[in-house]
């Protein structure tokens, strides 16, 4: 059990990542949060900015009512701003925004306007600072993620296989690829911490095959390791069958059906983790209140498969699964980059 107490080491960890974002003495910085945000991280962010001589100010919005039929977790599509133009304007005027909303701004509807206005956004995931401290980014991680993103942008086909029966193909031409290493200093861009992964959003009709979730894989929407096999059949991006007899399959079937939205069954993104500091067992070490599961997304060599929104394929939905799949082999145009769950030294 961790205590929500400010620690000097966490101020320093936050300051190091913020410094990497190009924040200098006297720079304004907007701290965007909502009433249900993790207050320890809000306080650490303010103290870290002051430690760097920046001039922080707070934008705090009420956490909105959940308009959906089920709890929403790990979507990356915060609804906290709610279209409030003054909040968007303040973010643009600040030039640098630290996002501490529960779900994050990555896919929020207001984010394009903030980025188009020239602001840069550091989204700090809703993790306990103990995890954030362990997952501090570094230059080597950034270099490898950049290299992997360039490789994926030039890839025509990703194929993923496993001994459990996974055989999935994603046609990558026209996909939008994002490399996330944990900070951004470039205006008009967004990064999130923890980082250490690369993901691609394929264009419509690009993903087909079978994905088998085996015991030990993870479902981060439910913050649990998979205990019994789940077999997903995917045709032209959509999950057309979800087979399995255990609680994992039932949870997934019920959650997807609750949305009443076909796009909740569609592929959001595909990619893989690259962070050697991210630990597979971490999900078992924290209570659900203290983790958002971001660490497992970044575990080196995991195949990160997600369902739900893909704006690059014209699909918008709040239903979302992030599924780190362990032990797969990932090939890009026939070149293996992950073998049996181990990231190869090719980036």
Outline where the language-model segments fall.
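Active-site bordering "gate/hinge" segments
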Residues: 1-228, 235, 250, 261, ...
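Active-site proximal loops enriched in glycine and acidic residues that flank catalytic Cys/His/Asp
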Residues: 33, 213-215, 234-236, 243-246, ...
């Amino acid at each position: 059990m961790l205590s929500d107490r400010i620690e000097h080491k966490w101020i320093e960890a936050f300051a190091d990542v913020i410094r990497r974002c190009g924040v200098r003495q006297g720079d304004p910085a907007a701290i965007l949060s909502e009433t249900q945000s993790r207050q320890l991280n809000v306080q650490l962010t303010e103290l870290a900015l002051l430690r760097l001589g920046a001039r922080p100010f707070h934008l705090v919005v009420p956490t909105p009512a959940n308009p959906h039929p089920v709890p929403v977790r790990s979507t990356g599509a915060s609804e906290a701003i709610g279209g409030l133009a003054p909040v968007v304007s303040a973010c643009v005027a600040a030039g640098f925004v630290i996002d501490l909303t529960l779900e994050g701004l990555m896919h929020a509807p207001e984010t394009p306007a903030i980025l188009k206005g020239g602001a840069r956004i550091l989204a700090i995931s809703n993790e306990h600072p103990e995890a954030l401290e362990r997952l501090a980014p570094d230059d080597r991680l950034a270099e490898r993620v950049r290299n992997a993103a360039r490789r994926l942008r030039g890839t025509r086909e990703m194929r993923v296989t496993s001994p459990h029966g996974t055989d999935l193909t994603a046609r990558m031409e026209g996909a939008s690829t994002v490399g996330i290493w944990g900070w951004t200093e470039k205006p008009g861009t967004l990064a999130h911490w923890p980082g250490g992964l690369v993901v691609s959003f394929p264009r419509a009709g690009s993903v087909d095959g079978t994905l088998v979730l085996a015991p030990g894989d993870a479902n981060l929407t439910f913050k649990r390791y998979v205990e019994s096999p789940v077999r997903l059949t995917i045709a032209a991006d959509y999950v057309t069958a979800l087979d399995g007899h255990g609680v994992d399959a039932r949870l997934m079937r019920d959650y997807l059906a609750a949305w009443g939205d076909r796009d909740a069954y569609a592929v959001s993104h595909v990619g893989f983790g690259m962070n050697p500091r991210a630990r597979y067992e971490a999900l078992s070490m924290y209570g659900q209140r203290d983790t958002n599961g971001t660490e497992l997304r970044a575990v080196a060599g995991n195949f990160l498969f997600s369902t739900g929104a893909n704006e690059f394929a014209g699909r918008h939905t709040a239903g979302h699964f992030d599924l780190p799949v362990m032990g797969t082999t990932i090939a890009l145009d026939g070149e293996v980059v992950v073998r049996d769950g181990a990231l190869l030294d090719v980036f």
